[in-house]
Amino acid sequence: MRYDYLIVGSGLFGATFAYRAKQAGKTCLVIDKRPHLGGNVYCEKTEGINVHKYGAHIFHTNNKEVWDFVNSLVPFNRYTNSPVANYHGELYNLPFNMNTFAQLWGVRTPDEAKAKIEEQRADVAAMLGGSEPRNLEEQALLLVGRDIYEKLIKEYTEKQWGRDCKDLPAFIIKRLPVRFVFDNNYFNDAFQGIPIGGYNVLIDKLLEGIDTRTNCDFFNLHYDPFIISTLSAASPLASFKQAAFALADKLVYTGPIDEYFDFRLGRLDWRTVTFKTRIEDTPNYQGNAVINYTSHDVPYTRVIEHKHFESFGQSVYDNPKTVISEEYSTEFQPGMEPYYPVNDDRNNSLADQYRALAAAEPNVHFGGRLAEYKYYDMDKVIERALNMEI
């Protein structure tokens, strides 16, 4: 069978595009090199709990069209992201708000909190003498002062990036939201939640009635026995591209853009994360879905307790066990999963060169975080796929 589209990657971009293409009467084959569908939003069921295998994914958006779209497929729960920071055993609410300031300084009013922050910011401004911040440390100090920076930003950021804050560019932190209200809701968006039953339910709905194949590496497509038999190729296929366009008229690619071009201009840099996940014999390990560990003495950046994404109140205790994941940030090495683009001057310039190559590829659409070398929240990925021409 020849398809209208071969879609490489079954994450939110690929799955949403496939859904729209099917609605438009197009035929699609979605392939994924992993043994499952869903990309990084895939959930693994453990002890009756949907475990976010590739890290916490909390859906939030101000885009009502996107919110209505996902809710037309699956209902979402009322989960609200309210992380907590642990600094040497001291607990602070996030994002930075009046609860945080009360915990830091014992202040009770917005005016007291503003005065404390302005006092510390003024000290930094005087130190800089009117010059622009030269690095992330100076930028953060100028934005929020020394106490917040040293307890809640400095060491956490250094663990995330693997570098001293003095060696990180200032543009990484353009602004730091500070709220002078008692509100622990991390996001300002109008809509927020988790699909009831987990993200697999959403992916299954998006890909319903669409041909899919897992454990299928796009770059080895021309060697895949199933693909070869599907094509009934009389002679060996010369390349993955030849196989792709033997299968379909058009290609949607959601993998790393540099890999598509065989790294001919050089490799783009990424940050990645790894997880150590375990079952705990307690119904409630930490009392919150996400706790950030903001000091160097703890090697991981945060602990995720997956149960709290979907269980509330007494239902937390209905299951006597829980599942937690320690998240570790690390430098990307070939063979690891790329997570976050490193948007410094070198990588931005290189990405632009790859985008120019991509624009010249006939009948190939590049979309999503990896293929565009951009950090996207989930709603933006879906919005992009909804607006792409079929």
Segments (PLM) and residue ranges:
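Glycine-rich FAD pyrophosphate-binding loop
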Residues: 22-47
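Dinucleotide-binding Rossmann-like beta1-alpha1 core, especially the glycine-rich loop
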Residues: 47-123
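Short loop/edge segments at beta-strand edges and connector loops
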Residues: 9, 80, 214-217, 222-223, ...
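N-terminal Rossmann-like FAD-binding beta1-loop-alpha1 element of flavoenzymes
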Residues: 3-30, 389
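Mid-domain catalytic core of redox enzymes
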Residues: 24, 224, 230-357
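Short, solvent-exposed loop/turn segments at secondary-structure junctions
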Residues: 12-13, 35-36, 99, 158, ...
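Active-site/ligand-binding neighborhood in enzyme catalytic cores
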Residues: 90-92, 99-236, 240-247
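C-terminal catalytic lobe of FAD-dependent flavoproteins
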Residues: 337-390
